[in-house]
Amino acid sequence: MAEEEPRIGVYVCHCGVNIAGVVDVKEVAEFAKTLKNVVVARDYKYVCSDPGQEIIQRDIEKYDLNRVVVAACSPRLHEPTFRRCVEEAGLNPYCFEMANIREHCSWVHMDDPARATEKAKDLVRMAVAKARLLESLETIKVDVTDRALVIGGGVSGIQAALDLADMGFEVILVEKEPSIGGRMAQLDKTFPTNDCSICILAPKMVDVSKHPNIKMYTYAEVVEVDGYVGNFTVKIEKKPRYVDEDACTGCGACAEVCPIEVPNEFDEGLGMRKAIYKPFPQAVPSVFTIDEEHCIRCGLCEEVCDADAIDFDQEPEIVEEEVGAIICAIGYDTCDPTEREEYGYGVYDNVITSIELERLINASGPTGGKVVRPSDGKKPKRIAFIQCVGSRDPHRTNPYCSNVCCMYAMKLAQLIREKYPETQIDIYYMDVRAFGKGYEEYYERSQKQYGIRFIRGRPAEIVEDPETKNLIVRAEDTLLGDVVEREYDLVVLSVGMVPRDSADVIQEVLSISRSPDGFFMEAHPKLRPVDTAIDGIFLAGACQGPKDIPSSVAQGSAAAARAATALAAGEVAVEPIVSEVDEEICGGCGTCVELCPYGAIELVEKDGKLVAEVTAALCKGCGTCAAACPSGAMEQNHFKTEQLYKQIEGAFRDPA
């Protein structure tokens, strides 16, 4: 294609008035006709429309065009549209070039139409200069392993695994903790229906364990991922439980005789568990785990285990799995409230977090569902909730809203009022964000039916009465314009969501990006909300950002659907705009290997010397290697050095 005489068609889009309201599009089209190798140039109101595309296709046939340039909006928006358009007319889709005269001209130079028009001409001249050297490229096809990996066994990961398994794909589910279930397993009820949380979750957990297409690794972590979309090799480290999962019946005799008690993490340290334990009654798998750090190896559990399931000889084990797609659903942590020193968490016994209250009010919690003060075990008569602890605080903690705190505070307040109607409850808030289906009605019900008082103002300080252990909350009521000071028996901090501690490791293992707030970054917030920048790796649930249970479940299903798109096809198409190596001049220095952000390049030995080799399925065409190569051995398809030089020359003059 590059050797034949270029015959170029140029099409200038009005984009309604987005471009034509500033840029003189007719003048730009007339200018394009003067450029070498341009056979036809037109302007049209909406080139991306069906009639606009038909004009291009007719011209390709009529004028025997072998290159097409469209001057319009961002390539991110309509480049795929026009590539498909020219391909349908028999032209290679990579013999198309786009000049962005909307974002780069009309939108940024609205106050200077004349200069915007001249700049548009420059961009068209540059695009035509590059188009003369465009080459036909062929899409790369990659075979797909029709299995998926789901990292994280919370409700979002569970939903993703079940959806994929129900579609007929084999799923590998990896959970870091001894049981799947995640945060939802800790909750008592779910808003806005106040349904029993575990009653909803437990059947899905059982479905995962029983599904013939799901292989579950609990108490395990993904430690290494190699490969690319359709062909990932995953290494999983199984931590030793010191209990044979296949032999254990979950009877609990071992825990009954174990002499060691330690704070129970599942109950947020409010209750105790044994050194051999099951996280919660509905745990899946329903087997016990020995806490190596606290076990004293007394042997009592071995003596009473009729199933002979205790195995102190277990060691960490690495297993390897081949998958075609990966869904990351590792969930979230709650923020550390000690960062807000003025609230006294960790100093005052009766200042607790919302997740601690969840465990107190839960019938399977450390108090059997009784809400009591940690200081003396008495039932609190006056309770204050403080919102936005760790959220919407750009100077001290996190700038973002955690989405769920307003709603779960109302839920907990309602549950307390149902159990103890005489309890007085105040919620100190900045703004109530009741955005979901049925949430506004839930908010109104909290006030009118349950008598919960909402005080608009962020408390400045909490102090403790040393004799009664009661807490005095000082805040400004911004609606009344008064400073209020009220005494409470218990203060609950509504803590926000933060990224998991393990997010650093997962980011490195998967080579995915994180947004400034620390959560994993999606490829596009609107158009590709569950994709990552790495093909074949998807996001689900709160690891991508704070969200409630319905949104997490929906995103789990969305991620499963996106993964299934690749798995079901049997092969995936990889864009050929990738780097290639001229092995004759490659010196094997490894600069490209070190700089490639996608791990797409490695050094291999060929004919007795080291040369770089690009895995096309991993390459994203970013051009880092081509820019850094000291010998000029790296060239990126569609952005080759000569093409870019001609484009640069075109910025100043017609290089022809």
UniProtKB/Swiss-Prot annotation:
Keywords associated with the record: 4Fe-4S, FAD, Flavoprotein, Iron, Iron-sulfur, Metal-binding, Methanogenesis, Oxidoreductase, Repeat
What does the record give under GO molecular function? Answer: 4 iron, 4 sulfur cluster binding; metal ion binding; oxidoreductase activity
Q: Which InterPro entries match?
A: 4Fe4S_Fe-S-bd (IPR017896), 4Fe4S_Fe_S_CS (IPR017900), FAD/NAD-bd_sf (IPR036188), HdrA-like (IPR039650)
Listed cofactors? [4Fe-4S] cluster; FAD
What the protein does?
Part of a complex that catalyzes the reversible reduction of CoM-S-S-CoB to the thiol-coenzymes H-S-CoM (coenzyme M) and H-S-CoB (coenzyme B).
Q: Which family does it belong to?
A: Belongs to the HdrA family.
List the protein's name. Answer: CoB--CoM heterodisulfide reductase iron-sulfur subunit A 2
Organism, scientific name? Methanopyrus kandleri (strain AV19 / DSM 6324 / JCM 9639 / NBRC 100938)
Provide the gene name from the record.
hdrA2
